[in-house]
Every structure is written in structure tokens, then in C-alpha cells.
Amino acid sequence: MKKIFILFNVFNIAIFAQVLLPFFIINSAFSQYKGNVNKAESYLNKSELKTDIGEKRSLLIDAKGEIDLAMTIEKNNIKARSWYVQANIYSAIARQFLDIDPDAIEKATESYKSIGDKIKTNDVTLIQNANVGLQNLSSHFVNQAIFALQGSGEPNYEVAYEEFVNSLKIYPQDTLGLLYGGYVAEQLYKYDVALDFYAQLIKMNILSKKNTNTIYQNSINILFNHCNLFDECDSFEKSIKLISEGKNIFPENNYYPSIEINIAMRLNKVDDARNKIDNQLKADPTNASLHFNRAVLYYNLG
């Protein structure tokens, strides 16, 4: 009976260990941290002085660990300054070490935006600093994208695209990010993304005439040249809608009537194509492209 009792207790201890072990592991992850906001900020400040990437990384990991624990404590979580420190820490991680936390951009953005909104404060300077921090983080990604395109050697479209997308996580309606992000997406054959970015810009209707014309033409070209990707080849319905809008905004621009002719020819609408070509030639009798299209049309008719 004694042996059975011993075995029973050994069995219980084993189960007890299995139950408590995860708790000890999770708890030990925080054991080196005290949940002190000032200490978290101190780690961040030290990291900014380091030139060695390894040292900087290690300090930011500690800053993250300290602030993560601190923000679970109610007295810290209700203070705007705590959110500001958290935002700055995640902003620093987002700039160089996204592998530490892939959601660092979103966390920094949410923290900055919470100050003065979700987290009330009368500290106007702190609210202003939070806005500046948010703008600086966005500018960082935009500058990285531009450098990838224009820095040296061949443009790195992959890096540029990634950085523009990062900037749009902060300001989703940033016109620069949408405009150039759309252009870069085209270079990477991400036509659905490019169309989405351009559609947002068209809806916002705040670009210059030149850039508005560009996004209309780019959108139409994508739909026309890659109609199979967008279920367009049988009708070109989306293309025609954009062409109609473009013609209303830019009535003197020959691109829109010309692409209309190309669509009519693709759809084998012979009479429609002929009439459009003849009307365009009356307005622009020296247009070589129109004469070529007319010749092709009559050649195909036999």
C-alpha cells in the first residue's frame, strides 16, 4: 500500500508540474521587468545613443518588455504619457526591427492617435508631440520608399512598395502614398492594388489636374491591357465608365476618344469604331494614330 501511495504522489506531482510549468514560463518572461514606464523610456533613450545594431536591438527588446508590462497596470494605462512612451518605443521598433514585432507600426500609430482622443489629457504639448511623432514615422517610410526608387542604381520596386504600404498604415488616405504606391504596384504587376489605390484617389478628388489625368489613364490602361484579370474583355464596362468620366474632366485630351476607338475595335463594333475614327479625324486630321487605326479597321473588313 505504501508503494502505491508513493506512485500516486509521483503521478500527481507530474500533473501538477504540467499545469504550472506554462505559468512559470509565461511569468518568467516578465520577471526581469518591473512594469516601470520611466525604465522603459530609459531603455529607449539608451538605444538611440547606440550605433551597434545588436546593442540597439537588445535595448529596444527590453524597452518593449518593460512598457508591455507597464501598460497592463491600470495606473499607467490611463496616463497619456505612458501611451506616448509606448508609441515612441514601437515607433523605434517599426523603423528598424519589425521582426521584433510585426505589428509595431499599427501599435505605434494607435498609441500616438490615442493621446488626447481615447486617453484624455490637458497637456497640449504632449498632444502636439504625439502628432509630430506620427508624422515623422510616416515620413520615415515615405523617404525610405523614395530612396529605394531614386537612391542609387536600379530602382528597387519591392522595397519601395513595402515602404509605401507601411506609410499607408499610418495615414491610409495619404495622397503621396496612394499615388506613388499605385505606380510602384504597377511595376510589380500588382494591378489590383494599383487600381484600388487609384480608385481611392479618384474618389477623394483632391489631386492636381495633371495627376488626376494620370490616374485616370493608368486605370484605363490597366483595365484595357489586362482585361482578363478583371472580367472586362467581354464589355469593358469599367473602362468605359472611367473613359466617360475622363472625357468630362479633360474634354480636349485625345487619349480618351482614342482608347474608345480601341475598345470598339476590340469588341468588333465596326460601325461604332468607324464613326468614332471619322469624328476624331475631323477634329485632328493629321493624327497618325487615327489614320493607322482607320487603315487597320478597313483592312480587317477586307
Positions of predicted regions on the chain:
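Bacterial Sec-dependent N-terminal signal peptides
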Residues: 1-37
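Amphipathic alpha-helical repeat scaffolds of TPR domains
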Residues: 32-49, 76-96, 122-152, 176, ...
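Canonical positions in the second alpha-helix
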Residues: 70, 115, 167, 201, ...
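Structural marker of alpha-solenoid helical repeat scaffolds
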Residues: 73, 118, 170, 204-208, ...
